[in-house]
Amino acid sequence: MVTKKFTTLLVSGVLAASMLVGCGGINKNETVATLDGQEIKLGVANFAARLQQAEADDFYRSYFGDEVWTSDLYGNGTTMEESTKSNVIGMIENLYVLQNHMADYDVTLTDEETAKIADTAAQFMADNDEKAINALGATEDIVNEYLTLVTIQSKMRTAIIADADTNVSDADANTSAYSYVNVSKTSYKDAEGNTQEYTDDEKAELADTVRKFHDAAADTTLDTAADEYGYTVSSGTFAADNTTLDEEVLTALEGLKNEGDLSDVVETDNYYYVLRLDEITDADATEQHRQEIISQRQSDLYNEVLQGWKDDAEWVLNEKVWEKVTFGNLFTTTVESTEAAEDNTAADNTAADNAVTENTESVDGTESVQ
């Protein structure tokens, strides 16, 4: 099949490399890992890592500055460069494992797909000058192999998830609509907009006010009572497998059996809630939840199959070789045109969990990669 998108390798802008630091080059033919004895070359892994760095630079630097890659942004003892490289080499392992199991699902690349991959790789090389190519460590063979692996991954995922159970019962999919008022038990905004903590006396008074509000809502409507008490009515949906609502709130909602039913005052650690069941079955939300369940089953199956293959394989990473890949320079993207995104694409988006970075195009850089 000829699919519509690759990893949009040739689309929205021109990248410029800067801030060069000790760029002595790397040997693209060096073995960075082995998979059941198969040598995985550094060239593809390096290209994937630099591609991801180039894509992320503008966003990260706008928030965290030029030292982003050497910073421990999340306080876990790992720099952003280390974290990104760890994700990339994990992706590389996945790609080659999937390639080695193509026969398990009768997955092949058509002549048309292979030709499109070759054309895209050649176009990428033609669109970038020598300095740009060196900055990403790209060769036509490396780009071709990377796009081949990504395309195989997409086709393998499609084949694997075809076995997922897509039969979701109405009961499992059912999603209800509700309205609610929530009132903070701990703090409030004063006239100047500053956050103030309630005193114990104020907390007792607040509890009484919320009870009176509930009684007013029961006598009139939730909306009318909210207007009277200066509260805001919000809305939401919930299903039986909801994991985001407080347990007390979900239990109260599940106890409402008829549309229009009002809950008692529900108390959580930080809020009071008054809830109203609006629709036992929200048709649109129910269908959306059905698709979410199917999507989760597909992802779970894909991950289970892939992990099984990985468990059975022997992947050995040469840490010293992988350490040679560094993000010593930074990239800036200049958007030229969005039309090219439609004209230069070749394979479907890979699955959401494929960890492949998208949107790199023409690059202007000066790093040497051998």
Show the residue positions of the predicted features.
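Peptidyl-prolyl cis-trans isomerase
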Residues: D208-V249, A283-A285
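Bacterial N-terminal signal peptides that target proteins for export
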Residues: M1-L10
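N-terminal targeting/tethering segments
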Residues: G24-G137
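C-terminal motif of bacterial Sec signal peptides marking the signal peptidase cleavage site
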Residues: S18-G22
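Sec/Tat-exported extracytoplasmic proteins
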Residues: A49, A56, I92, Y96, ...
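PPIase-associated folding chaperone regions across multiple families
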Residues: I26-K28, L35, A132-K212, T244-Q370
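Short linear loop/turn motifs
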Residues: E113-Q123, T237-T244, K324
